[in-house]
Amino acid sequence: FRVGRKSVYLLGKQGQEPNDSMDYKGLTIHYYNKPPVRPNMLYRWLNYQGYRRKRQIQDSAGIARQRSMQSLYSLYRQTRIQERLASVGIFRYAEMQYIPRDTAFVSDTLDVRVIAALDKPYDAELDFNVTMKSNNQTGPGAAFTVTKNNVFGGGESWNVKLNGSYEWQTGKASSSLMNSYELGISTSLIFPRVVFPRMGDREYDFPATTTFRLYADQMNRAKYYKLLAFGGNVTYDFQPKSTSRHSIT
């Protein structure tokens, strides 16, 4: 079978059916009121010809044969696209349908239809913990994280995390006055792709992320030291093939 027309149906926040559409490089995008995802990103995620084995044999017959092979249906490519839609983390569900253009199978063309609904735009998480150390210090800690999904319409997420802890040393001696605390704030911007000069347009067969992070921490250890730390980092996680995965910070 060969892959024919490709279309995406993006449901509204309350499950509304699309009421408008647009065409981007042969990809028909149906949406409710306004596109919640940038057309160029949908095209990158669903570009069927972009997901193919690197070891695919290309003969000297040239481009015509290569293009012909790329238009063929492939379970490998279908799996890669489904993984990509799941990994961006902005869809509540996404369903891929392959519809025969001719039910009598006279035609060998399958039209691809993707039906998807976006997840909630915000996530919040609250964690509590209690620490007990060998130096008799004990105390509670908490962390609160708020995440905004699909920040720029391309699957990006931005989060802010606040964390704090307080510990005191148990005992009857004066050491029981040795109380410690820690306060921190961090923010991260996560892209579901590699963001790097000359590599920003490249799509790997497997999910990849780029994380930009800034943080600041205030730490007080009674009768020992006080420490104010702040900084940032960039982390690249990518998987060029199924048997290897890389993380660079």
PLM-predicted stretches and their roles:
Residues 23-25, 40-52, 61-67:
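Acidic/histidine-rich, surface-exposed loop or edge segments in extracytoplasmic proteins
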Residues 35-38, 57, 66-249:
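Gram-negative/organellar outer-membrane beta-barrel architecture
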Residues 1-3:
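Non-catalytic accessory/assembly modules
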Residues 11, 28-45:
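Flexible hinge/switch segments at interdomain interfaces of large molecular machines
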Residues 7, 16, 22-34:
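Conserved oxyanion/phosphate-binding beta-strand-loop segments in alpha/beta enzyme cores
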Residues 9-10, 115:
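Generic structural detector for well-ordered beta-strands
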Residues 30-32, 51, 71-72:
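Mature-chain termini and adjacent capping regions
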Residues 12-20, 33, 46, 50:
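Structured extracytoplasmic
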